[in-house]
Amino acid sequence: NYSDIFSQAFENEQEHIFSIQFNADYTDFSARMLWYLGPGKEEWDKFNGLGGSSAPTSFYNKYDEWDLRLEHNLAKTWRGQPFKDSRIAVIKYWDRTGKQMLDHDGLNFPVFRYADVLLMYAEALNEWKGAPTEEAYDAVNEIRLRAGIDEVEDLNYKQFQSLIQDERARELCYEGHRRFDLVRWGILVETVKRVSKEINSKGGEYVSEAHNLCPIPQTEIIKNSNLEQNPGYETTQK
């Protein structure tokens, strides 16, 4: 099931194609995802400066109430008490056994797993054929059935594209994929602006189309005068 993917008892199973290996027995090789995302304490305030990450309400609402991934990834309460300011906590990497240390655990981090392959396959078929194929439905429904939610059918190109965008968020959240997805879909800037406004952050004021790419390191431009800086970063070029 979905929760097993993020359990040390099932690490490096078939779902995991490539994972960063961690070991709690060695300080330099232990993971700290729980430290940064939380919670591991009873009070949210204890994460100030080293965590306290929260999910926007719009993301929480992307889940069906019966979706098994919801209760594994997000939480509105901790031991029966709501979080401060009604925040939504990220608990994806929380060890349900209670043996995990907040800043010192051995849970591997998934870089590439089978669910990602299925979602990429379904997305590619929809883009290629201009509509979802039987194989595309099979791929995405395999993931949805594992999550305990209904299969989908009879969608057009745009509907299936929107479904894939939401399904990747529900399935792969906090695994390091979202920015790359938003860039690929051409909606990075509008999404950052919208979410920033929702959570009352100023981040949306500074994002621009230039952020679809990173700047070419100045050291490389100095080495090769034929290199042109990526759009939006030209002022860094000498």
Where are these regions (language model features)?
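Hydrophobic, small-residue-rich alpha-helical packing segments that form membrane-like cores
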Residues: 1-3
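Flexible, polar/acidic helix-loop-strand segments at domain edges
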Residues: 58-114
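Active-site rim segments in enzyme catalytic domains, especially the processed small/beta chain
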Residues: 37-61, 66-73
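Long, intrinsically disordered, low-complexity segments
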Residues: 8-43, 49-53, 104, 109, ...
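Residue-level signal for threonine
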Residues: 56-57, 133, 217
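A broad, low-specificity signal marking well-ordered, structured residues that form hydrophobic/aromatic
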Residues: 15-17, 68, 91, 140, ...
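Extended, hydrophobic/aromatic-rich amphipathic alpha-helical segments that build helical scaffolds
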Residues: 18, 67, 109-143, 161-175
